[in-house]
Amino acid sequence: WIIPFIPLPVPILIGAGLILFPTATKSFRRMWAFQSVLLLSIVMIFSIYLSIQQINSSSFSQYVWSWIINNDFSLDFGYLIDPLTSIMXXLITTVGIMVLIYSDNYMAHDQGYLRFFAYMSFFSTSMLGLVTSSNLIQIYIFWELVGLCSYLLIGFWFTRPVAANACQKAFVTNRVGDFGLLLGILGFYWITGSFEFRDLFEIFNNLIYNNEVNFLFVTLCAVLLFVGAVAKSAQFPLHVWLPDAMEGPTPISALIHAATMVAAGIFLVARLLPLFRVIPYIMYLISIIGIITVLLGATLALAQKDIKRGLAYSTMSQLGYMMLALGMGSYRSALFHLITHAYSKALLFLGSGSIIHSMETIVGYSPAKSQNMGLMGGLRKHVPITKITFLLGTLSLCGIPPLACFWSKDEILNDSWLYSPIFAIIAWATAGLTAFYMFRIYLLTFEGHLNVHFQNYGGKHKTPFYSISLWGKNGIKKNSCLLTMNNNESTYFFSKTKYPIDKNERKMTRPFMTIAHFERKAVYSYPYESDNTMLFPIFVLGLFTLFVGSIGIPFNQDGVNLDILSKWLAPSINLLHQKSNNSMDWNEFLKDAVLSVSIAYFGIFIASFLYKPIYSSLKNLELINFFVKKGPKRILWDKIINGIYDWSYNRAYIDAFYTRFLVGGIRGLAEFTHFFDRRVIDGMTNGVGVISFIV
């Protein structure tokens, strides 16, 4: 029971210190960061110990305190330690510690350094409380605290109007889901008379078996519970807050997208799966929402210029895979992908933070510039360690063996064939799209030359390679001199106009370690690699990405069972009355793996063809000419590509639809209500008063 409360003293003491002793608290601010890491490390040790116990003993542990209000109603508070809890606790603590260490350097120059660590520790407390909850009321309390923390962290730089609007959007969108969750909790309490998970599942199964419930009402309550998970895990149609959540600091994006907020929705569905699985229509709904989100997230990631927003839509798509697996009843596959994706995505977000951190010294502290992939390029020469680790995370998400996400995604893809061929085709096609958009991000960021020196910030292009489109370099221009190689024509790849580097910029000279509390005096003409305190967490997450997939590989041939994940999840799988298939047909596995990896490599090839800089592959000019012939077919193809690009870049116009019809309609209703209240209701009251005064 103490696990959620171990990190809690940090936000309390920081808040009290800033109120009572602000100067002293700020002067010892590094001490608070150390305490945050220390306390979360203690929780991690507890979590690992509990996980080892779970693997060895395959048991549940639950303790409940009853608060009796009267003879008919009581509130129970306690903790539930089962495989799902231990997995989530291990994820939250390991990723959280890496993010806190990384943040010490990343936020070193920020005025809100202490506030940031207070919010982060409170976020960890809220999420740990959520995953250890033993009943729905406790879940709902910590669910709201997680939403509050995300609101505070997304709007951390609240003086920026964009960040203020983003945190409000996330908060309001999640309130829709939270209201549904509350109604669903009350509905199931009315049906079963209990909030406790074990009692709830047992009573509900008996009611279903004896046909003593109204299936329409039960289905409605289950849908309302699921709506809460849809909003929190950014599933269609309540996904609109996720890309805007990138307005917060990058370490927050890593934590939200890897192990906390978006994982909470997956956790809730996994926790309530014994309830959902006896209501077939809900399982169909979960799988349908999952497959729609898989495809929508992947297509919306195709044309994003902001590196963090591209990764955000990637998260949305991968969460769709997890939701699809849960809807198919593949409990093990969903949690396996939750684990592998968490480390890979944390690695990618911290890597993007390292890139942004290095770009800020050139383009300034404007997210529109420092996160714009159109201003990047050629960073492999300047940030080699970040490049290697980012490539590792990219390959993992693409599903390339032997990296982590290959094993988990392959399980989901194989299970989808058994569930529905249509869903399987969409899921496999999206695996190719995943490889395409992830390598698009990688190539635009690390390959070619640094584009920032060939731009002006007035919005005019000084080079044909600035604009990003689905085709890469603003499409391939039919009249471009790159497409003809006549003897009398010269070939050039950049504008002939020279753009001198600012006179204040000078060659990069800096020590490998920097003192965090002093401003950098130099302005660099090129990006530079991050400091050790930022590279260490990235390196550790890279190791996780390499090796964490091995816990779910069923190496259990010849009577030797080394499938750690199946041992870990055995109690939960038994509760779901599922047969755990610990054996693997390696011939079948290799056949499916070859197909999935081939699709991934095809996506990588297409991305390389479209986004690899033309000037680095002159030998491909004839191939490019083949695809860029004039004619009606080419014009039609351009229109199709531009339509897809506009649809993707404008977020499938879903945000515009919500803004125009939902937000506009609600604001119109609010204005009418305000007018009616002030002019009609108050007018009647004031009129009676005036008449009384005259009489």
Swiss-Prot record:
Protein's UniProt keywords contain tRNA processing: no
Superkingdom, natural source: Eukaryota
GO cellular component annotations of the record: chloroplast thylakoid membrane
EC number(s) per entry: 7.1.1.-
UniProt keyword list: Chloroplast, Membrane, NAD, NADP, Plastid, Plastoquinone, Quinone, Thylakoid, Translocase, Transmembrane, Transmembrane helix, Transport
Location in or out of the cell: Plastid, Chloroplast thylakoid membrane
Class of enzymatic activity (EC top level): translocase
Residue ranges the record marks as coiled coil: none
Membrane-spanning segments: 1-21, 32-52, 81-101, 117-137, 139-159, 177-197, 211-231, 250-270, 278-298, 319-339, 346-366, 388-408, 417-437, 535-555, 594-614
MF GO annotations: NADH dehydrogenase (ubiquinone) activity; quinone binding
Entry-linked InterPro entries: NADH_UbQ_OxRdtase_chlpt_su5_C, NADHpl_OxRdtase_5_subgr, ND/Mrp_TM, NU5C-like, Proton_antipo_N
Pfam families membership: Proton_antipo_C, Proton_antipo_M, Proton_antipo_N
Gene3D superfamilies with a match to the protein in the record: 1.20.5.2700
Gene Ontology biological process terms in this record: ATP synthesis coupled electron transport; electron transport coupled proton transport
Membrane topology value: Multi-pass membrane protein
Reaction(s) this enzyme catalyzes, per UniProt: a plastoquinone + NADH + (n+1) H(+)(in) = a plastoquinol + NAD(+) + n H(+)(out); a plastoquinone + NADPH + (n+1) H(+)(in) = a plastoquinol + NADP(+) + n H(+)(out)
Quaternary structure and interacting proteins, as annotated: NDH is composed of at least 16 different subunits, 5 of which are encoded in the nucleus.
Stated family: Belongs to the complex I subunit 5 family.
Functional summary from the UniProt entry: NDH shuttles electrons from NAD(P)H:plastoquinone, via FMN and iron-sulfur (Fe-S) centers, to quinones in the photosynthetic chain and possibly in a chloroplast respiratory chain. The immediate electron acceptor for the enzyme in this species is believed to be plastoquinone. Couples the redox reaction to proton translocation, and thus conserves the redox energy in a proton gradient.
Protein name: NAD(P)H-quinone oxidoreductase subunit 5, chloroplastic
Source organism of this protein record: Capsicum baccatum
